[in-house]
Design a protein with these regions (language model features):
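Non-heme Fe(II) oxygenase catalytic core, chiefly the N-lobe of the double-stranded beta-helix
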Residues: 1-224, 229-258
Length: 258
């Protein structure tokens, strides 16, 4: 095992990165790490990228709070990769559990590498040169529809205009091809008609959640997950209302998908 509540040696950092490239998502139990060591763990993978819309841990603006309560239940339950509305989406995410419900609240992950490899060669070729648009506003449309929602997110909308990413990207470390569209932030594929774009995206959204491409993690107190945001998608399961769930997340800066 490994104790993440401390300073990692260079050999441990290298081992974690190699394991992440191989398995795409890593799970750890019994890691009661402080906010400082959460930050240091994330920094071992690269510079940190902040989120424009969520509350953060006091004294640690890098750590995003993801919280669901009876008064304010979580609204996001779609499959997605984190923050693909950015020109440089995060390369990885480090998420730790702080408060977990007695039952429910699991998270699902899907391998976009396996999903790509599960396509026919003809479909791989067809998708290879397509470009899709990702939009911050599309992912937060429920919040924007709330009273005062647009005013609260106005600055984030201005700072995050729609961006273009390849439908099929190349993983910069493994060289493998992955599907890089998601139902939360991807709005359409360029140079196709609206109906063509919708049909292709819906086909891909259905394909990527094929059970053979997925895994499921049951959170315990002080559990921690690290996932490769370039080659996976995930989905939180909101099946624990009205119970309380609080997670704390750090995203690590990535590159421009190609």
């Amino acid at each position: 095992g490994i104790d993440l509540n401390g300073v990692l040696e260079e050999s441990q950092k290298k081992a974690l990165r190699n394991l992440l490239n191989e398995h795409e998502v890593l799970f750890f139990r019994n890691q009661d790490i402080s906010p400082l060591h959460h930050k240091l763990l994330a920094l071992s993978f690269g510079p940190i990228q902040t989120h424009p819309a969520y509350e953060t841990v006091k004294g640690f603006p890098e750590i995003t709070i993801l919280e669901s309560t009876a008064k304010k239940p979580s609204k996001i339950e779609a499959w997605h990769s984190d923050m693909t509305f950015k020109k440089h989406p995060p390369m990885a995410t480090v998420l730790k559990s702080v408060i977990v419900p007695e039952r429910g609240g699991d998270t699902l992950w899907a391998s976009m590498t396996a999903a790509y490899e599960g396509l026919s060669s003809h479909m791989q070729t067809f998708l290879s040169d397509l470009i899709a648009v990702h939009d911050f506003s599309h992912g937060f449309k429920e919040t924007l529809a709330e009273p005062g929602g647009r005013e609260r997110l106005e600055d984030a909308i201005i700072m995050n205009p729609p961006v273009r990413h390849p439908v099929i990207r190349t993983h910069p470390e493994t060289g493998k091809k992955v599907i890089f569209v998601n139902s939360l932030f991807t709005t359409h594929i360029e140079d196709l008609t609206r109906s063509e774009s919708e049909e292709i995206l819906n086909l891909l959204f259905k394909h990527i959640i094929t059970p053979e491409f997925t895994c499921r993690f049951q959170w315990h107190p002080h559990s921690l997950a690290i996932w490769d945001n370039r080659s996976t998608q995930h989905k939180p399961i909101n099946d624990y209302f009205p119970n309380h769930r609080r997670m704390e997340r750090i995203t690590i800066d990535g590159d421009n998908p190609y």
